[in-house]
């Protein structure tokens, strides 16, 4: 809320402003989403991490961990072993919260849905990368010696307060960035 009181000689009237509170209490009002028993039909399905829509466009486009899962993880896999030298992981850092200007800044230091601590695991469950204090949207992991595996799993160990949300996991034989 506020009030605009311009100088009297410029021809603009005094008026009150009302600005709604952003994400009041961190809650989405009047909305409950439950995980479907059939995750293939869930709007937050694991398959979303293979999409290249790394923001909510016509749907969530993210895998969201079940808050009841004590060991949440999402896996991308292939029929045959792949040689991977780079992995790009795209986390939810609140793309749907508009920032009218970069001068406005963000009202929180850490976005609740962003994954804070995670591991990448190969097809035998070995940790091939670990990040312990992530704040970033895009995590680029480069291996000097390529990893050969039939799958890469992202294991979420902690977030900044809300269930983990992941927009993408993309693995490359040759680095793309």
Residues covered by each model-derived region:
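Hydrophobic beta-strand segments within beta-rich accessory/binding domains
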Residues: 85-89, 154
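Trp- and acidic/polar-enriched beta-sheet ligand-binding modules for extracellular glycan
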Residues: 67-71, 93-177
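Disordered, acidic Ser/Thr/Pro-rich linker "stalks" and the adjacent N-terminal cap
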Residues: 1-81, 90-114, 171-177
């Amino acid at each position: 809320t506020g009030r605009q009181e311009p100088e009297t000689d410029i021809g603009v009237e005094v008026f009150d402003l009302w600005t709604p509170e952003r994400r009041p209490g961190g809650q989405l009002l009047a909305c409950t989403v439950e995980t479907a028993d059939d995750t293939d039909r869930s709007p937050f399905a694991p398959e979303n991490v293979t999409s290249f829509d790394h923001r909510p466009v016509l749907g969530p486009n993210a895998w969201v961990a079940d808050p009841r899962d004590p060991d949440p993880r999402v896996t991308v896999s292939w029929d045959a072993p792949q040689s991977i030298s780079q992995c790009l992981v795209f986390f939810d850092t609140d793309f749907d919260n508009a920032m009218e200007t970069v001068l406005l800044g963000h009202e929180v230091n850490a976005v609740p849905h962003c994954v804070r601590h995670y591991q990448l695991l190969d097809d035998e469950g070995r940790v091939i990368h670990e990040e312990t204090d992530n704040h970033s949207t895009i995590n680029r992991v480069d291996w000097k010696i390529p990893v050969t595996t039939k799958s890469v799993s992202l294991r979420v160990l902690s977030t900044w307060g809300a269930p983990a949300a992941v927009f993408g996991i993309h693995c490359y034989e040759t680095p793309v960035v």
